[in-house]
Amino acid sequence: MACSGCSCEAAVGAMASEAYLEGAPVREARELVAELCRHFYAQGWVTGTGGSITVKVNDPTVPLADRLIVMSPSGVQKERMVAEDMYVMAADGKVLSAPVAKPWPNKPPKCTDCAPLFMKAYLMRGAGAVIHSHGIETCIATMLIPGAKEFRVTHMEMIKGIKGHGYHDELVIPIIENTPYEYELTDSLSEAIAAYPKATAVLVRNHGIYVWGESWINAKTQAECYHYLLDACIKLYQLGIDWTTPEHGSINNPRRPHSILSPEICNGCHAADSSKCVVLDIEGTTTPISFVTDVMFPYARDNVRKHLTSTFDFEETKEDIKLLRIQIEDDLQNGVAGAVPVPPDEGGKEEVINSLVANVESMIKADRKITSLKQLQGHIWRIGFQKKELQGVVFEDVPVALKNWHASGIKVYIYSSGSREAQRLLFGNTTYGDLRKFLCGYFDTTTGNKRETRSYFEISQSLGVDSPSQILFITDVFQEAIAAKNAGFEVIISIRPGNAPLPDNHGFRTIKSFSEI
């Protein structure tokens, strides 16, 4: 926990002292960054003086958020880096120690142009180290799907090396557009970090990648995994293999006209036949509303206290609580009914949990579609599915349709207000078995509000279609249908038992079963 008041000022002053700056922790951090620069140069990540590395000083007596920062300089040959070349900064980015100028032809010392971006990763993610690589694979990978806002890959072993991911998961890396100057990327990087709470990296189109971790070892390991995966995807592209689907089928297979790189489209009279991709809502579309309202929501509500109590000190739950605190603070400022203040951690575990439970119960009762709630619910449901206390329910026509679309080469995605993890849990544990093999990806509220047109525009960019009209969206919610239609999607409204009535003359095609498509 960060220090405060006079004690904080004293601590900062002590760390800014010459004795501390020349002490073992700072010296070791300087040497580490120099060593990593030389190592990454050999990997081809920081050639031509490009790329950069930063780490927090490893001093266990100081909270991570308050530790000093060591950054590599700009314009220096990375393979010749030494500890004396490094900049040392306070936790707020203030330079405390700068390198001494070297004779010509060396350039005057200058801190890395990545500094403001590194600071965002430190402040927004609580990182312990950040790596910026110009590895050629990080540049080429963003060119494979022009205009895409995300890079997606699934079912590859090295995905397990990325925090919070497993072999079966879909790894999603946000892509931001390059700018003439590095510092101009700061806002778009911040937006990507905020929009993708699970991400530990951001790609910059035609440029490189930023990777962060809780320690230099974690950041380095993940960076190696990202480079491996991106390089593998480029090679798969050259071989005509689709890396975005579980089965990794052929990109140019005539039975797979939907492929992310294939321009051909099937000709046919049915909606799915004229689409490269199908995007499905869950509640009221693939799954009865009653299952969500009568089974899933009550399970999360009834187990939230138990979950928070038993996992309070877990990193995953700490992140959940952090997101809830941010949402609750915003709710309090906006006068949202049911929002109650959450005491600081010093107030005691029980008091914090009591207030969180009250807020979560209020959020569930109001059926709020917010990321902080959906992420926590997903973690609670995960335990329920693991214990076999929950089993996913889908309408009987859904597995048949998914199988047929899959066999026809049509990619199917899910877009739900539930977290991506919750989506995978539901479809991976249904009464019809594991249906995830028929699904190519998952979108949730990190993409955007389901009733906003821009969310569907983002999805169309991510799927790499030539036109949004090549995407069929099926939902039970009229407002979502309007938003998707305004984004150029083809839209069908699902009529299922328990769904809300539609307005007269709504203008959309409706179905009562996927067999009608």
UniProtKB/Swiss-Prot annotation:
Keywords: Amino-acid biosynthesis, Hydrolase, Lyase, Magnesium, Metal-binding, Methionine biosynthesis, Multifunctional enzyme, Zinc. Binds 1 zinc ion per subunit. Binds 1 Mg(2+) ion per subunit. Its EC number is 4.2.1.109, 3.1.3.77. This is Probable bifunctional methylthioribulose-1-phosphate dehydratase/enolase-phosphatase E1. NCBIfam families: enolase-ppase, HAD-SF-IA-v1, salvage_mtnB. GO terms for cellular component: cytoplasm. One of its GO terms (molecular function) is acireductone synthase activity. In the N-terminal section; belongs to the aldolase class II family. MtnB subfamily. GO terms for biological process: L-methionine salvage from methylthioadenosine. The active site is at E157. It catalyses: 5-(methylsulfanyl)-D-ribulose 1-phosphate = 5-methylsulfanyl-2,3-dioxopentyl phosphate + H2O; 5-methylsulfanyl-2,3-dioxopentyl phosphate + H2O = 1,2-dihydroxy-5-(methylsulfanyl)pent-1-en-3-one + phosphate. Disulfide bonds: none annotated. InterPro entries: Aldolase_II/adducin_N, Aldolase_II/adducin_N_sf, Enolase-ppase_E1, HAD-like_sf, HAD-SF_hydro_IA, HAD_sf, MethylthioRu-1-P_deHdtase_MtnB, MtnB_viridiplantae. Residues 1-242 are annotated as: Methylthioribulose-1-phosphate dehydratase.
